[in-house]
Amino acid sequence: MKNAFIVLFCSLLFVSCKQEIKPTDIAKLNGYWEIEKVVFEKGEEKEYKMNETFDFFQIKNNKGVRTKVMPQFDGTFLTTDTFENVSVRFAGDQVFLDYKTKYAKWSEEIISLSDDKLVVKNPQKIEYHYKKAGPVNLLNDGEKTK
């Protein structure tokens, strides 16, 4: 009986921690995202202090692309030829990003999404934690980049 109570409590705790993603939240995906850390299935974490590339999402009507971009010191971005077509899929209380290239298809579940944080989980139960990013401007004496 005690074990059943512990399992029930842990299940409720897990369910209550998950954010409900609404269709109106999807617009928050648009923009530049920098990976902060990766959390593996057994809880190990890998932190990223600095990234050479950001993910740029451009989604409209639940379809769009994710492109790898490289921030430059003058506040601009170089775009690589690497991109994935992205579709947003709502399945019950879960929301997925379905990716497709010429060579592969895969999905990631959106665990949480806010104006400045994004967490997704892949089928291998690896979580990717992102923070919203912007231009890096180390030139022009700190003038704000447009």
Question: Language-model features: where?
Answer:
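Sec-dependent signal peptide recognition
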Residues: K2-L8
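C-terminal motif of bacterial Sec signal peptides marking the signal peptidase cleavage site
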Residues: L13-S16
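N-terminal helix-cap/turn-to-beta initiation motif at the start of protein domains
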Residues: Q19-E34
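Short, solvent-exposed coil/turn segments at beta-strand boundaries
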Residues: L29, F56-V65, F90-Q94, I111-K117, ...
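Short, solvent-exposed loop/turn elements at domain surfaces
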Residues: F40-E44
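N-terminal glycine/threonine-rich, aromatic-flanked beta-hairpin/loop signature
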Residues: K46-G92
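Edge beta-strand at a domain terminus
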Residues: F83, K121-K146
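Surface-exposed, polar helix/loop patches in the mature regions of secreted/periplasmic/lumenal proteins
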Residues: G92-K131
